């Protein structure tokens, strides 16, 4: 049975960085769980993150990312690059199916097993099945309102949940200021 769907969104505005996610886990055509937590703090609370994909794979990657973050003395970009290199080169890790968003006060990165570490051009980035909807909503709100990052993230996930059947509005959020 396949587990599907998630929406994870990162937003930066006015010195505040937010990563939030919905709570829905879908198995086949059934909502399996509505209050899953796909967002967490890492690096002694200095990094916020969210994942899309396999939970077990994401947890394994979080553990490795924390090690890279510590060994890079809190350099988020270096930790992201080092994790990606290891992910690509290790035969067991290569099979892991997850995407990670990681952020600190200044940066948000998307980390993938394809060897990418991407920093968004804009002040928003999203992953998962509802990601395109949340991203579009966040960009519209960033460009046309004075809402703060937290409000933008909440509204964007809520909009994604109204469009994507694999996304709900049970939001988990982590904030760094």
From Swiss-Prot:
User: Which positions are annotated as binding Na(+)?
Assistant: 161, 164, 167
Zinc-finger in keyword set: no
Q: Which domain of life is it from?
A: Bacteria
GO BP: proteolysis involved in protein catabolic process
Using the UniProt record, give the first listed, main subcellular location. cytoplasm
Q: Where is the active site?
A: 6
What does it catalyze?
ATP-dependent cleavage of peptide bonds with broad specificity
Give the regulation of activity.
Answer: Allosterically activated by HslU binding.
List the record's Gene Ontology CC terms alphabetically.
HslUV protease complex; proteasome core complex
Q: Which GO terms describe its molecular function?
A: metal ion binding; threonine-type endopeptidase activity
Q: Tell me the leader sequence span.
A: none
Q: Where in the cell is it found?
A: Cytoplasm
- E.C. number: 3.4.25.2
Q: Has UniProt tagged this entry with the keyword Hydrolase?
A: yes
Note one Pfam family from the annotation: Proteasome
Keywords in UniProt for this one?
Answer: Allosteric enzyme, Cytoplasm, Hydrolase, Metal-binding, Protease, Sodium, Threonine protease
Q: Return the NCBIfam families for the record.
A: ATP_dep_HslV (TIGR03692), PRK05456.1 (NF003964)
Q: How does it assemble?
A: A double ring-shaped homohexamer of HslV is capped on each side by a ring-shaped HslU homohexamer. The assembly of the HslU/HslV complex is dependent on binding of ATP.
Task: Give the UniProt family note.
Answer: Belongs to the peptidase T1B family. HslV subfamily.
- Task of the protein: Protease subunit of a proteasome-like degradation complex believed to be a general protein degrading machinery.
Question: What is the name of this protein?
Answer: ATP-dependent protease subunit HslV
The coding gene here is hslV
């Amino acid at each position: 049975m396949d587990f599907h769907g998630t929406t994870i969104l990162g937003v930066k505005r006015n010195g505040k960085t937010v990563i939030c996610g919905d709570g829905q886990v879908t198995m086949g055509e059934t909502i399996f769980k509505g209050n899953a937590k796909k967002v967490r703090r890492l690096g002694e609370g200095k990094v916020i993150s969210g994942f899309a994909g396999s939970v077990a794979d994401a947890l394994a990657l979080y553990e490795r990312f924390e090690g890279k973050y510590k060994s890079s003395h809190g350099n988020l970009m270096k930790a992201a690059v080092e994790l990606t290199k290891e992910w690509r080169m290790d035969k067991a890790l290569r099979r892991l199916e997850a995407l990670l968003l990681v952020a600190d006060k200044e940066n948000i990165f998307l980390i993938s097993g394809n060897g990418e570490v991407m920093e968004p051009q804009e002040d928003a980035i999203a992953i998962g099945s509802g990601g395109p909807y949340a991203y579009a909503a966040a960009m519209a709100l960033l460009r046309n309102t004075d809402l703060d990052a937290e409000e933008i993230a909440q509204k964007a996930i809520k909009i994604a949940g109204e469009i994507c059947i694999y996304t709900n509005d049970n939001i988990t959020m982590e904030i760094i200021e």
